[in-house]
Amino acid sequence: MEAEEPPEARRRCPEALGKASGCCPEAPGKARGCCPEALGKLLPGLCFLCCLVTYALVGAALFSAVEGRPDPEAEENPELKKFLDKLCNILKCNLTVVEGSRKDLCEHLQQLKPQWFKAPEDWSFLSALFFCCTVFSTVGYGHMYPVTRLGKFLCMLYALFGIPLMFLVLTDIGDILAAILSRAYSRFQALLCLPRDISKWRPLLLCRKQTDSKPADEAIPQIVIDAGADELLDPQPSREPASPSCNVELFERLVAREKQNELQPPMRPVERSNSCPELVLGRLSCSILSNLDEVGQQVERLDIPLPVIALVIFAYISCAAAILPFWETDLGFEDAFYFCFVTLTTIGFGDIVLVHPHFFLFFSIYIIVGMEILFIAFKLMQNRLLHTYKTLMLFVCQREVSLPC
């Protein structure tokens, strides 16, 4: 017969099993409490991204409808007709005899305008979607642009709302990337057993964090009525017992303090409970609002060496440069690398034109993430340059002070 387990062992078994399996009796309540917070962190970014995708689809439908319809005036363009007539007159001459006609032909061909050959068929839905992505991402390659008057006004209005929305998405995604880069670099430091020193590049940020964390308790006035209340109000309390007149005066001062606090707008308390499902919506809204207030803070706190971020950028662009020539057969690795760099830095010269821009739409997420990585790199470089400039100015000022008059 098997030995019967003592009751203490039976009582400890569920706890031991719970710890061994990674859960405990309080885990369901904690999981329910963590779900609104996790959803509150993901929901703003997902909403921003969905708004940007919807905005791009609506813009593609508008531009394909405006620029894609046939224009009867474009078929009889007087400017194009005049250009062709002059070109025919130049070509009637014998170019081998008249050498000046060749120069006139070259100068005349330089006056050629690309919009003369823009066809409505070029503005399909996918082409218009590609154009919208180049507008609100501020890339603007230049080989695709609106020609009609209505299309130009629509493009300006579309950019006014699309560019801030794009920057908002970039800021939110930047926090995620900054958290990933910071954790990856911390694990890399732990693997190599490198010391984690406090960064010297962000002293102002640390001071700002300390000052921001101070007034949290000072902003909420508290009234404590106890035996030592007169000690709180009087900086030099007397050791003699309080008289009735002092008690009346103390009570009047407390009432005046309470009335003054009532004039301030009351702060709505946030109740937290894992057993009441009605409070889930309240916790979710509070989590969303708190995360919206912290948008962009993770990027400001990020501090990793510039060679690390430069290596990440090089690897990121190289991956796209190796994939892009599979459908853009005219591009080699060097041209594809150059095109991706010009795109991610929002320079957008327009010297390289994609033959199949529809396939490049699948790289929309790639473009957004790449632009954010470059933004983080530029932010880190800016902090380094500011630190170098401050160090140089301090050195110059100290040298001027040390010089004799």
From Swiss-Prot:
It comes from Rattus norvegicus (Rat). Keywords: Cell membrane, Disulfide bond, Glycoprotein, Ion channel, Ion transport, Membrane, Metal-binding, Phosphoprotein, Potassium, Potassium channel, Potassium transport, Transmembrane, Transmembrane helix, Transport. Residues 138-143 are annotated as: Selectivity filter 1. Each subunit contributes two pore-forming domains 1 and 2 which assemble to form a single pore with M2 and M4 transmembrane helices lining the central cavity and M1 and M3 facing the lipid bilayer. The transmembrane helices are bridged by the selectivity filters 1 and 2 carrying a signature sequence TxTTxGYGD that coordinate the permeant ions. Up to four ions can simultaneously occupy the selectivity filter and at least two elementary charges must translocate across the filter to convert it into the open conformation. Activated by volatile anesthetics, such as isoflurane and inhibited by local anesthetics such as bupivacaine and lidocaine. Inhibited by extracellular acidic pH. Inhibited by Zn(2+) ions. It holds the Pfam family Ion_trans_2. K(+) 1 binds at residues 138-139. Residues 272-277 are annotated as: Interaction with YWHAH. The lineage of its organism: Eukaryota, Metazoa, Chordata, Craniata, Vertebrata. It is found in: Cell membrane. Residues 346-351 are annotated as: Selectivity filter 2. Residues 221-226 are annotated as: Interaction with calcineurin. This is Potassium channel subfamily K member 18. Homodimer. Heterodimer with KCNK2. Heterodimer with KCNK10. Interacts with calcineurin. Interacts with YWHAH, in a phosphorylation-dependent manner. InterPro entries: 2pore_dom_K_chnl, 2pore_dom_K_chnl_TASK, K_chnl_dom. Residues 125-151, 337-351 dip into the membrane without crossing it. Belongs to the two pore domain potassium channel (TC 1.A.1.8) family. K(+) channel that conducts outward and inward rectifying currents at depolarized and hyperpolarized membrane potentials, respectively. The outward rectifying currents are voltage-dependent, coupled to K(+) electrochemical gradient across the membrane, whereas the inward currents can be induced in response to activation of Ca(2+)-mobilizing receptors. Homo- and heterodimerizes to form functional channels with distinct regulatory and gating properties. GO terms for cellular component: plasma membrane.
